[in-house]
């Protein structure tokens, strides 16, 4: 039943009469709404941007989308199997449970509201984009909200909704309606009704702004007529009682609305009017018992998009605490998409927002959904078949937690984070355009409604946690504007127009930033642009005019703010910061008229500014970006650089300038005065088409010192190089120093230059001048480069008859100048003939050169009476021959002369032509610079195919004849050569080496692998007597390295080697060989005898003996003896061990006995005690402690009561025992902890639950719940694959293990094994057969009466997967078994036998790992098992 409003009460409401007179001058709501309500701006921004590939992130489509019922029945368990959880991901700060919905982050403890994930912050974008957003306080509305709270007890504001009207709900149940001029139009409801219904918790206005829906904190819903202010419906039974209305939303259909309550349920409200009676039907779309929805957003379309094919589905997006759903309300209820969040901070707020965007030339809705710091964009499209497809676009990862997301247009979004900071983001580039604080708004929060405090707080803890930061009803957007509801005010934010953004920067005196922003507008690269024409030419014209205005203002400000006093450097720095900006933007705008007109005149008023201006032009001129400069500016530019002594800069500028802008007379005079030859050449060539005069001037600079034989200065060398480059450019048709000569002048210039070069005499020639002065000067300056210039020129003159004549003529001149004069070096003469040889060797050669000239050159280069420049002469002749000059010589005569002159490289060149490779060996051996290269040469000839057998045999024989010479040259290289190519002649080679030292070096390189020679000893098969011969030489020349060498040598006989070492009295080496032979006792006696002799030497030393040397010798021998005993004790019985250790102990204690009986103590008494203690510690591991003590006490000396002398030894033994016992216990404890951790980790891994990757069978690709034809079991594997048992049986993926059936994953096994599964379990461990751990039966969807899924196997038997994991654990700790270690430790700890010095033990006790020499404890953290 409808309830009519109390009209009289409405008229008497003080709120209706209170109208704020003072309106914000900067805010015109109606104009702004009309400006941003059209779609054209969105389309334009979207089409201008880079297109997004909507197929790149396409979400796979399923044949049969899930029904709403199936989704509602899904559990909201967020746990995922086989994921190692990071406890820090769920770090939630303490939340103030007493916060109210009207409290603001700024006015309360904002630190309790968010757990921000602070990553690196984005850079400040103010200088790039300026101020993008403009915010204004709606003073009229704000004042009336405060007035209503004071005068009519309306309460504080709680919700806002905006359309062409603005509706504000209050905590006492009133709805205040304002028009576009901020005038109060209606006050809906009353405080009495508010006391019954509670606060307004949600508002919604329909599309045509005719109806208002109000949701209340106690669950009621009212509908109002906004035209008349009448109450049309009061709905109390749309949803379960006791829950607050969190959201209420009109759809595009005015008869259909959606509401969401604090129970997490979503209901569809259908409004009908039958026979004048208004009714409301409610239908549950989502039950809160299956997952609480806390945010809903229907898709709204603008009037121009009413016919869009997607609007007929009436899409609705819902966000629960675990997933996003997109459903269609029409024509029938259908789920189109589900998207799970993944792991999120439970206190973060889910957000949804729709907007139509243009992608790939079509306009479609895009859904933005976010929670925490991640924003996802989903594009919704309809295909030709009528189905809806959802594709995922780029996501946005932020460094702050969001509480609101709002579209301004299709390119720009506004985000609000949990500390009330606003972020303006460009969606496609993800660039942050602006940030601003809005704490002054004192934003209203909806916490009390999410906690449902008005109805007793009967909500879940998860929803209450989300409600701490919920402000859904406090922010509303309409027509490109965003309204923020504060506790006492309403603010509106909108994008600034492009002019406003520039003006905002200009007001703050940020002229440089304003120009940069304007240029981005000009180039179409700016973001969030409002107010510019879409036509490119119009846009550039409008922006350019505005930039010119700013540039004038910028120039005036630069002149006004120039420091009046101070150093000139301060003024220069000021203008260097400002003037380049003016120059840059004038040139960018292509306004040279402005730059060299008004701007130059304005800046010329200040001399410093004028100088900086002229200097700013330099980089543009050098890069050819600025060519046309007015003559006056160019004149001032040259004068300025002249005054500052920057002549090189002037020269670089002139050659890039248009010649018409130069004062030629001024420039030529300046160039001559300051020797700016590049500029001079440029002016002569471009200004007067004169190419010869510059050469004459340059020749006058370098010719006199060259003719006088003087060394050129650096400046003269530079001039000569410039002259060569200039001649080369002229002959090649290129302009100097850059550009090209006009095509019509190229032949003329070439002829003029050739005629100039071959002149017989210069213009002002003296009587003493030699002929052809120009050619002579260039040859003296740089022969090689001048000839290179000519060679390049000859390449271009092939088809020119006159040029051919020039070639012959200049060659004749070159020969005449160089051959008939003796003032040229061999290198210069060689360069000439090399040049000639190359020209003569060409197939189209037309030159003629007398052959006798080459013979003269050969005689000149090979003259034996001149030893100077030997290498230079040889190199010149070699280049001449390689260039083709060999055809000009008689080869036999050439070889004779080269041998006579010791030109071995020439000889090699000639011998190689005649295939006399054996003679080349002599060339290498006789050439001290290349003698070591002979080995590579011999190896290449003998191994590389392409040489005949006779040639190889001759080289082989030649090398054999010179073997001793090769060995003396480099023994290691010779040994490698012999091992590779002369392995069968080793004894012959050894016989040739008469020098014993040389033979020793050769054999060491051949046999000792430590020498680095790559020799395969197995293929070499050296007889033992050669190895023994090397050992004997080693004993002679390097006795201290014998043992180390014997350890790596092979193929020697022990008896003969022992005789050799005994011959040279190398006792340690003999002992090593005896031990290797197996005579450990004989080796021990030999070392013991050596030790005793050294101890005797030390005891009878005199004052002149070096004590340290004797003590070092004793210590070294003792250490070797102890090592021998330790190596052999493991293989001996107790009696044999005592036979080794006790004589050693006796030998060490004997000198101490003698010193105790002597009157004066021995000087090394303490050192001997320390060494004796070392012996005791070493033998304690093999001899029982009682046996050692008994042996000591049986000594006649200590048996008579002199135990005090050995007290230190006994106490040291006991301390060692205590230390080792502590170490043993600590090791056992560590091993126990390590094993316990590993077993616990293994148990946790194999008992973890499984999570399927998909909900369909990986073989038949059908959903496991859809198979109705048979009661299949469902088999889930640890790899995540899921199968029907019938499908898996059809693929033969079963095997029998101990009489039980085991399953194997079809995908994993087929990708790792080629054939069928092996029946051998050990083979299955080698492959990657993933066993099943969970079975579910049956596969179809269970009804409520069906029994729960049963486990397949109840017996506690390890399946192959668990066995594989256990084997992996064993491999991690491969080596000595840890269980065996613990068993041994536990057995030995029982009694006295645990002591290392206990009495005789049985064999197994002394064969344990603790007695092994290489036993090591792996004291490292245990490996982390992969989940």
Curated annotation (Swiss-Prot):
Placement of WD repeats on the sequence: 193-234
Zinc fingers typed RING-type, residue spans: 1257-1309
GO biological process: endosomal vesicle fusion; protein targeting to vacuole
Keyword Metal-binding: yes
Chain segments carrying region Disordered: 1311-1355
SUPFAM superfamilies: RING/U-box, WD40 repeat-like
Biased amino acid composition, Polar residues: 1329-1342
Pfam families on file: Beta-prop_VPS8 (PF23410), TPR_Vps8 (PF12816), zf_RING_Vps8 (PF23412)
GO molecular function: zinc ion binding
Transmembrane regions: none
GO cellular component assignments: CORVET complex; early endosome
Positions carrying Phosphoserine: 26, 32, 127
Biased composition (Basic and acidic residues): 1343-1353
Alphabetical list of InterPro entries matching this protein: Vps41/Vps8, Vps8_central_dom, WD40/YVTN_repeat-like_dom_sf, WD40_repeat_dom_sf, WD40_rpt, Znf_RING, Znf_RING/FYVE/PHD, Znf_RING_Vps8
Keyword Protein biosynthesis in record: no
Key words, A-Z: Metal-binding, Phosphoprotein, WD repeat, Zinc, Zinc-finger
Family label: Belongs to the VPS8 family.
PANTHER family membership: VACUOLAR PROTEIN SORTING VPS41, VACUOLAR PROTEIN SORTING-ASSOCIATED PROTEIN 8 HOMOLOG
Subunit (UniProt): Interacts with RAB5C. Interacts with TGFBRAP1. Component of the putative class C core vacuole/endosome tethering (CORVET) complex; the core of which is composed of the class C Vps proteins VPS11, VPS16, VPS18 and VPS33A, associated with VPS8 and TGFBRAP1.
Job description of the protein: Plays a role in vesicle-mediated protein trafficking of the endocytic membrane transport pathway. Believed to act as a component of the putative CORVET endosomal tethering complexes which is proposed to be involved in the Rab5-to-Rab7 endosome conversion probably implicating MON1A/B, and via binding SNAREs and SNARE complexes to mediate tethering and docking events during SNARE-mediated membrane fusion. The CORVET complex is proposed to function as a Rab5 effector to mediate early endosome fusion probably in specific endosome subpopulations.
The protein's name in its UniProt record: Vacuolar protein sorting-associated protein 8 homolog
């Amino acid at each position: 039943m409808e309830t009519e409003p109390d009209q009289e009460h409405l008229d008497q409401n003080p709120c209706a009469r209170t109208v704020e007179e003072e309106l914000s001058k900067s805010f015109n709501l109606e104009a702004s709404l009309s400006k941003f309500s059209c779609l054209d701006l969105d389309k334009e921004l979207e089409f201008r941007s880079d297109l997004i590939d909507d197929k790149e992130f396409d979400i796979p489509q399923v044949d049969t989308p899930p029904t709403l019922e199936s989704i509602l029945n899904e559990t909201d368990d967020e746990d995922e199997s086989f994921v190692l959880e990071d406890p820090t991901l769920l770090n939630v700060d303490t939340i103030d449970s007493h916060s109210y919905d009207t409290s603001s982050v700024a006015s309360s403890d904002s630190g309790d509201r968010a757990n921000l994930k602070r990553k690196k912050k984005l850079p400040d974008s103010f200088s790039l984009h300026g101020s993008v957003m403009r915010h204004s306080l709606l003073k009229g509305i704000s004042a009336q909200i405060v007035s209503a709270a004071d005068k009519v007890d309306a309460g504080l504001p709680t919700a806002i909704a905006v359309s062409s009207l603005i509706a504000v709900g209050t905590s006492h149940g009133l709805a205040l309606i304002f028009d576009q001029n901020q005038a109060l139009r209606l006050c809906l409801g009353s405080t009495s009704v508010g006391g019954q219904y509670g606060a307004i918790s949600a508002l919604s206005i329909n599309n045509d702004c005719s109806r208002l829906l109000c949701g209340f904190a106690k669950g009621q819903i009212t509908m109002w007529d906004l035209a008349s202010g009448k109450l049309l419906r009061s709905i109390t039974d749309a949803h379960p009682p006791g829950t607050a209305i969190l959201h209420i939303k009109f759809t595009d259909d005015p008869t259909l609305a959606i509401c969401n309550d604090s129970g997490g349920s979503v209901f569809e409200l259908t409004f009908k009017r039958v026979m004048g009676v208004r009714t409301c039907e409610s239908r549950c779309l989502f039950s809160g018992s299956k997952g609480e929805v806390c945010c809903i957003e229907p898709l709204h379309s603008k009037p121009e998009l009413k016919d869009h094919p997607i609007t007929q589905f009436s899409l609705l997006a819902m966000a629960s605490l675990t997933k996003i759903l997109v459903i269609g309300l029409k024509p029938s209820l259908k789920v189109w998409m589900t998207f799970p969040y993944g792991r999120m901070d439970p206190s973060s707020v889910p957000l949804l927002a729709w907007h139509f965007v243009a992608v790939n030339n079509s306009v479609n809705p895009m859904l933005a959904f976010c929670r925490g710091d991640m924003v996802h964009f989903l594009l919704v499209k309809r295909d030709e078949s009528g189905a809806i497809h959802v594709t995922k676009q780029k996501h946005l990862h932020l460094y702050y937690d969001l509480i609101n997301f709002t579209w301004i247009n299709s390119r720009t979004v506004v985000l609000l984070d949990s500390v009330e900071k606003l972020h303006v983001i460009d969606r496609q580039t993800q660039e942050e355009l602006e940030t601003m604080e809005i704490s002054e708004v004192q934003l209203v929060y909806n916490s009390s409604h999410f906690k449902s405090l008005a109805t007793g707080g009967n909500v879940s803890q998860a929803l209450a946690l989300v409600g701490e930061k919920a402000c859904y009803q406090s922010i509303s957007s309409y027509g490109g504007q965003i309204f923020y509801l504060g506790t006492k005010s309403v603010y509106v934010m909108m994008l600034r127009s492009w002019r406003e953004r520039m003006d905002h920067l200009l007001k703050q005196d940020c002229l440089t930033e304003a120009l940069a922003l304007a240029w981005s507008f000009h180039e179409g690269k700016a973001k969030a642009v409002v107010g510019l024409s879409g036509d490119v030419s119009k846009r550039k014209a409008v922006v350019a005019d505005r930039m010119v205005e700013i540039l004038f203002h910028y120039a005036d400000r630069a002149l006004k703010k120039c420091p009046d006093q101070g150093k000139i450097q301060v003024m220069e720095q000021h203008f260097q910061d400002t003037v380049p900006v003016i120059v840059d933007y004038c040139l960018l705008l292509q306004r040279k008229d402005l730059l060299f007109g008004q701007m130059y005149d304005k800046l010329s008023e200040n001399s410093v500014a004028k100088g900086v201006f002229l200097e700013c032009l330099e980089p543009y001129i050098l890069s050819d970006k600025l060519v046309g400069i007015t003559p006056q500016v160019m004149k001032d530019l040259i004068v300025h650089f002249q005054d500052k002594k920057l002549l090189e800069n002037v020269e670089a500028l002139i050659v890039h300038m248009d010649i018409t802008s130069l004062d030629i007379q001024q420039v030529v005079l300046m160039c001559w005065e300051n020797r700016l030859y590049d500029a001079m050449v440029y002016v002569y060539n471009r200004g007067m088409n004169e190419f010869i005069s510059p050469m004459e001037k340059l020749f006058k600079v370098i010719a006199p010192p060259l003719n006088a034989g003087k060394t050129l200065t650096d400046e003269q060398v530079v001039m000569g190089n410039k002259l060569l480059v200039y001649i080369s450019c002229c002959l090649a048709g290129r302009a100097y120093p850059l550009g090209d000569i006009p095509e019509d002048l190229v032949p003329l210039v070439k002829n003029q230059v050739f005629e100039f070069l071959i002149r017989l005499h210069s213009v002002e020639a003296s009587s003493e001048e030699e002929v052809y002065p120009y050619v002579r000067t260039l040859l003296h300056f740089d022969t090689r480069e001048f000839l290179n210039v000519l060679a390049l020129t000859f390449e271009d003159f092939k088809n020119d008859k006159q040029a051919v004549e020039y070639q012959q003529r200049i060659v004749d001149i070159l020969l005449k100048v160089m051959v008939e004069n003796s003032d040229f070096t061999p290198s210069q003469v060689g360069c000439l003939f090399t040049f000639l040889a190359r020209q003569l060797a060409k197939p189209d050669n037309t030159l003629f050169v007398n052959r006798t000239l080459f013979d003269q050159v050969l005689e000149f280069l090979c003259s034996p009476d001149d030893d100077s420049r030997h290498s230079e002469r040889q190199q010149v002749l070699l280049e001449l021959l390689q260039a083709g000059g060999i055809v000009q010589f008689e080869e036999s005569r050439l070889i004779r002369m080269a041998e006579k002159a010791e030109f071995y490289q020439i000889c090699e060149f000639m011998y190689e032509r005649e295939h006399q490779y054996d003679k080349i060996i002599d060339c290498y051996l006789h050439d001290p610079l290349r003698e070591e290269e002979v080995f590579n040469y011999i190896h290449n000839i003998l191994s590389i195919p392409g040489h005949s057998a006779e040639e190889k045999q001759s080289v082989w024989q030649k090398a054999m004849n010179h073997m001793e010479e090769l060995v003396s040259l480099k023994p290691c290289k010779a040994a490698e050569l012999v091992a590779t190519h002369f392995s069968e002649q080793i004894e012959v080679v050894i016989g040739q080496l008469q020098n014993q030292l040389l033979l020793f070096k050769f054999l060491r390189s051949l046999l000792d692998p430590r020498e680095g020679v790559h020799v395969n000893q197995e293929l070499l098969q050296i007889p033992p007597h050669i190895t023994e011969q090397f050992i004997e030489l080693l004993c002679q020349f390097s006795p201290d390295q014998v043992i180390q060498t014997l350890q790596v040598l092979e193929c020697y006989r022990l008896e003969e080697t022992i005789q050799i070492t005994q011959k040279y009295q190398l006792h340690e080496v003999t002992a090593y060989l005896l031990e290797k032979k197996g005579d450990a006792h004989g080796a021990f006696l030999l070392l013991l005898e050596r030790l005793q002799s050294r101890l005797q030497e030390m005891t009878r030393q005199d004052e002149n003996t070096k004590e340290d040397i004797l003590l070092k010798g004793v210590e070294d021998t003792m250490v070797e003896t102890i090592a021998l005993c330790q190596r052999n004790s493991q293989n001996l019985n107790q009696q044999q061990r005592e036979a080794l250790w006790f004589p050693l102990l006796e030998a060490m204690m004997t000198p101490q006995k003698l010193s105790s009986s002597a009157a004066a103590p021995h000087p090394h008494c303490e050192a001997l005690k320390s060494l004796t203690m070392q012996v005791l510690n070493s033998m304690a591991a093999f001899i029982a402690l009682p046996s050692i003590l008994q042996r000591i006490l049986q000594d006649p000396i200590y048996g008579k009561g002199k135990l005090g002398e050995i007290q230190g030894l006994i106490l040291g033994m006991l301390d060692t025992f205590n230390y080792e016992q502590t170490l043993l216990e600590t090791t056992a404890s560590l091993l126990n902890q390590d094993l316990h951790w590993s077993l616990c980790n293994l148990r946790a891994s194999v008992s973890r639950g499984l999570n399927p990757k998909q909900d369909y069978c990986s073989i038949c690709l059908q959903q496991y719940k859809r198979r109705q034809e048979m009661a299949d079991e469902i088999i889930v594997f640890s790899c995540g694959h899921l199968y029907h048992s019938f499908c898996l049986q059809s693929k033969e993926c079963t095997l029998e293990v101990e009489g039980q059936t085991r399953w194997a994953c079809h995908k994993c096994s087929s990708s790792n094994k080629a054939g069928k599964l092996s029946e051998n379990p050990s083979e299955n461990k080698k492959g990657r057969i993933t066993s099943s751990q969970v079975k579910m039966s049956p596969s179809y969807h269970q009804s409520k009466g069906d029994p729960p899924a049963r486990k397949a196997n109840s017996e506690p038997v390890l399946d192959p997967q668990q066995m594989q994991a256990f084997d992996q654990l064993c491999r991690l700790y491969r080596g000595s078994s840890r269980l065996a270690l613990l068993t041994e430790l536990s057995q030995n700890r029982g009694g006295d036998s645990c002591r290392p010095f206990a009495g005789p033990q049985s064999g197994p006790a002394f064969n344990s790992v603790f007695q092994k020499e290489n036993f090591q404890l792996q004291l490292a953290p245990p490996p982390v098992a992969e989940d």
